Amino acid sequence: MRTFVTKLLGLFLVVLAAIAIGAAGSSQAAVVSYFANLSGPNESPPNASPGTGTGAVDVDATAHTMHVHAVFSGLLGNTTASHIHAPTAAPGTGTAGVATTTPTFAGFPLGVMAGTYDITLDMTLASSYNPSYVTANGGTTASAEAALFQSIADGKAYLNIHSNVFPGGEIRGFLIPLATPTTATSWGRIKSLYR
């Protein structure tokens, strides 16, 4: 009898944990994270800059925000601008106009060869976009947000850091989705604890 009660209690805890994970997953489902490996060879055309960097972008369609974080070093020139370009004609290749703030992200470290940047943009504000991007994508911030988030999801957006040596961009990287655990994989992990 005690074994049956223990198993029943264990099953109850598994179900309770699955419900909690499902609730946590659904409350965070709107946030999607992307990563970019920034380098000169990723530019179009490629360049020989020894500069490197990483970018992380979290888009939240529910909160209408986009968090941008970048770390870079080893540039040959001093930074002049940074922003996200979108959409390219094909995923992972080509060039596109500036989609986000022009001439650069607010507060981006300019005149340096290495730095760190972190900002959360309110995507309901026109100041988060290049005005021509808004015009080309329906004329409202809502339509521009939808277009930009879709371009990022489609692999047609890249983070670019420009310098005085490479005005068209010294290092860039296309935004690719980060692998995130799903409710199904979390449920599988919970079940494996009781096998």
What are these regions (language model features)?
Residues R2-L13:
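Bacterial N-terminal signal peptides that target proteins for export
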Residues V5, T140, T185-S186:
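Secondary-structure junction/capping motif
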Residues V15-S26:
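C-terminal segment of classical bacterial N-terminal signal peptides
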Residues G25-A179:
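N-terminal leader/targeting pre-sequences
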Residues L178-S186, R195:
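Intrinsically disordered, low-complexity regulatory segments in eukaryotic proteins
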